[in-house]
Curated annotation (Swiss-Prot):
Record key words, sorted: DNA recombination, DNA-binding, Transcription, Transcription regulation, Translation regulation
Family: Belongs to the bacterial histone-like protein family.
This protein's encoding gene: ihfA
Name of the protein this chain belongs to: Integration host factor subunit alpha
Function, as annotated: This protein is one of the two subunits of integration host factor, a specific DNA-binding protein that functions in genetic recombination as well as in transcriptional and translational control.
Cysteines paired by S-S bonds: none
GO molecular function, one term: structural constituent of chromatin
Length: 98
């Protein structure tokens, strides 16, 4: 299984548009920066036909060191969640697996 990288996205964008590779790379970076900044500002990011990104706060909870069995607290933190939209789930779910 291969991975799609930001560089791959920029290359594909430059092939489909009149942007050169440098401009396409900047466009991809700006896209992800915009999503990051919106999440940092506490906004929900809704991409129609794709899905929603949201920042959630997780409370502190008890955990366990798997090597020693010692109980340790897992600190509170913020996590990014993604919920795929219905159209996206249908499109991905209907693809054939080789």
């Amino acid at each position: 299984m291969t991975a799609l990288t930001k560089a791959d996205m920029a290359d594909h964008l430059s092939e489909l548009t009149s942007l050169n590779r440098r401009e396409a790379k900047q466009m991809v970076e700006l896209f992800f920066d915009e999503i990051s900044q919106a999440l940092i500002a506490g906004e929900q990011v809704k991409l129609s036909g794709f899905g929603n990104f949201e920042l959630r706060d997780k409370r502190e909870r008890p955990g366990r060191n798997p090597k020693t069995g010692e109980e340790i607290p897992i600190s509170a933190r913020r996590v990014v969640t993604f919920r795929a939209g219905q159209k996206f789930r249908q499109r991905v779910g209907n693809e054939q697996i080789d």
